[in-house]
Amino acid sequence: MEAGMKHRILLALAATGLLGATAFGLYGIEGRAADSGETMIVDVPGVPTAALNAEIDKLFNEDEFAETRALVIMRGGEIVAERYAPGYDRGTRFISWSMAKSVTAVLVGLMVADGRLALDAPAPVPDWQRPGDPRGAITLRHLLHMSSGLQHSEAGDPPYDSDEVRMLFLDGRDNMVRYAEGQPLEAEPGSKFEYSTNTSVILSDIITRQLTDSKDPDVRRRAMLEYMRGRLIEPLGMASMVPEFDASGTLIGGSIIQANARDWAKFGEFLRNKGSIAGNQFLTRGWVDFMLTSSPNDPAYGGHIWLNKPRAAGLKKVLYPDLLPGDVFAAQGHLGQFVIVSPSQKLTLVRLGKTQDDVLDPVKEQLGRILALFPRD
């Protein structure tokens, strides 16, 4: 069978969900995986291969970029560079941390497309719908834009005082959504940006309650897992993806979904292609456009995803507004997890590792230098 015909058949199978881990372009390296410590690079017209290899070497070998564990770069749907640190390989699952938020946003979009949720209706949280509760004004749009107005601290000093840590690891951990949904308002919904992992757990609960009325943790877990598998994991061929749940059966949709580097790249490609796989629309283009449109209170944040836009004075730069195209966007997670997508360059870059957040800037800058080596269309 000639290579072109094989390529078309693989794409057709991907579109039907019948093709597991090969659902997206592994063809640039013919399905081969880089051995630990080795960089696999495909020559790309207009890209200086030696310079690309050198910059990737720095990312893995120089102390200021430690600890990079995996890198995958896709261009035009094909893997053009891939590398793993010793002890890791293409089968290794990596924790998402906050990259999970963007997965949760996609699940919300599927629910909206199905007519089960509405973006600007009051968020269907029963406790908020009691007469006189001001939280009844919170909408899905507010939650996706991190502007619910709920009282929240994402990072505290000491850390165990933060609402995020309390929900994930301390007094809220067994029923995370009860902790998250139980917070009072501290601002009018829609009036300010407040980055919140707890908000994504609220969205996870809202999705789950559209799937089942049961409060049984196992039933809730199964309902969400089946929905994710049928609508996202299998169509995208992300066979390694493992969502994590708390003791009450709620998806930890703000921080704990695991997948290997190639599957995270498939997720980025899915968004780069506006929710389409091989010409088949699995998520509406309008929803992806919503995710990639600046929120009112922070232009660098969309619908549960970061955008390559300047921020207000005093706020830290998130991506590369002075270096890369304005349509760049990224799912980012604690300790240096990145899925960075540049539609103008037909690129998706995944970097996974463990770098403390207070020394992460050099890693982020190095990823920008790598992306800048690729031409724009």
Model-derived features with residue positions:
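N-terminal Sec-pathway targeting helices
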Residues: 4-15
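A short, well-structured edge-of-sheet supersecondary motif
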Residues: 58-88, 339-340, 346-350
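Active-site SXXK
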Residues: 77, 94-120, 143, 203-207, ...
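Short, charged, amphipathic alpha-helices and their helix-cap/turn boundaries
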Residues: 78-83, 159-188, 219-241
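Active-site helix/loop module of the DD-peptidase/beta-lactamase fold
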Residues: 95, 113-153, 182, 212-255
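Active-site Gly/Thr loop motif
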Residues: 174, 238-245, 293-348
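Active-site-proximal alpha-helical segments within enzyme catalytic domains
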Residues: 199-207, 255-276, 337-353
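Structured C-terminal helix/loop/strand segments within mature extracytoplasmic catalytic/sensor domains
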Residues: 328-377
